[in-house]
UniProtKB/Swiss-Prot annotation:
Its EC number is 4.1.1.19. This is Pyruvoyl-dependent arginine decarboxylase 1. Its cofactor is pyruvate. The modification Pyruvic acid (Ser) is found at S45. The record marks S44, S45 as: Cleavage (non-hydrolytic). One of its GO terms (molecular function) is arginine decarboxylase activity. It catalyses: L-arginine + H(+) = agmatine + CO2. Binds 1 pyruvoyl group covalently per subunit. Belongs to the PdaD family. Keywords: Decarboxylase, Lyase, Pyruvate. The gene is pdaD1.
Amino acid sequence: MITKLIPKKVFFTSGAGTHPEKLESFEAALRDACIEKFNLVTVSSILPPRCEIVTKEEGLKELSPGEIVFCVMSRISSNDPGKTLTSSVGCALPVDISKHGYISEYHAYEESAQDAGAHAVKLAESMYSTWTKEEPLKTFSIPRSSTVKDSGDWMTVISAAVFVI
């Protein structure tokens, strides 16, 4: 028997990390977002029907270290001193919970968290509206911004929608 992997819950998080090594700056960002303990698999932009949005704390309680966890993630890295890095995920909730919504990912250099969040919402809203021909019930974003330190160490910024099966 094949089990369908349809998430029942989702939580949103973000993080930023810095380190002389690019990979370790990503690890630091995952730690800041509290999702470093999982084997993350990035997926595309669908919020499943009837998927409950929970707090990060609630979602983390249902996951185990080493678990394969699906997520929609925006990620950006640089070691260019003074450069501002911004990531965001946006969400468009369906009017009818029996239908799916959309999650977008967006990242940019030299853009404010507010602007990146607005752009991520615009993307999610557009994907939803062009499919349903209606406005979503609600939209929101989880933006994060940070600036590369003068030391030239790597900075990574992430935003993620993390699914719980």
